[in-house]
Amino acid sequence: NGDIAHNGSAMAIGYYTNTSEAYSSNDGWTNYTTSTVGTAGSFTSGKGYQMATNGGSLVEFNGSTINTGNVTFTATTNEEGSSNANDGTKFELVANPYASYLSVTSFINAHKDTQMHANHAAVYGWDGAQYDTYSLASPGNGIAPAQGFMIGVRGSDGTSQTITFTTAMQTDSGSGDYSEYDPMEDDRAELFINLNQNDYNKETKLFFLEQGTDGLDVGYDAATMDLGNYSIYSRLVADDEGVNMDHQSLAYSEMWDKVIPLGVNALAGEQITLGISHRTTPADLNIYLEDVIEGTMTDIKAGDYTFIPSSDINGVGRFFIHMTADTMSNGEVSTSMLNAYKEINANYITLEGLATQSNNINVSLYNILGRKVLDTSLN
């Protein structure tokens, strides 16, 4: 196809491999070349591919038949145990195999409990600049015909899962690559927090639903797929194991008294703006952003919080969202986040929040027999 973009012999069409070796060499992507494309064979139904054209021109696909039955695809994870790693080894690139739109809700519901990674039981779609997250908390999404998308695969290194696209997942509604409509049913509210620095805009989404809880709600909570110099995310209110969440669902009935850890990655010396980009919470619910380092409490319904950091920011423990019926002011509350967890297969324990602690932290570690094996103080 002459409309496929080229860069020398490299063609702007290729596939994704999630091994650590492939990811370290080119973020997992392999492009066909003018010498390899001729022997590449046919597209695999259900497998995703990357593609770019000259000037955004249309690409024509030809085949003898279209899929009218169920389609299966084998997805494999090469993750070695880190639940919060963002190296791409837990993801597979799949695609809608039908000539109709595919329901994200139906797809996730069919795979979230067995085949999809518990922290990543969502659909991740590339928008040309970053990955957008679609979960059960963002209802009514449709994936365009042949559109590719990333999914997290459940299991230890080398585990394969069968992904099944069924005709029942097809829908006749949708437009564009990923269509989204939001019926905003009763007992539902949304709060999106935005980070802006150097003209980069990032967003994390909080949903308040009847089925939401403070812990992990598989399919409704979705971890971030990729992090960079500019990122914003939340942490689970309960049972936090160091996983950075892009979508977090919480109980609608409990939103009047909630403190949510907020993570920020940003660079030193450049202005940062944190604010609300979308809100459907009740008008009389106050929403404050706490900066533990500065000791400030900002009403972000009234305006954004803007500052210039003196050093790079990376992680959680400094910022918290407070949702309350009360009026709060600077110095009234000082939230402290000290979190400890161990990754699967890791031979170490991660401690978070030390930078925001004003006093020394005493750490004691016991083995399964109850014997103290470590007793130390951290400054």
Located regions from the model:
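Compositionally biased Ser/Thr/Gly- and acidic/asparagine-rich
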Residues: 1-10, 16-379
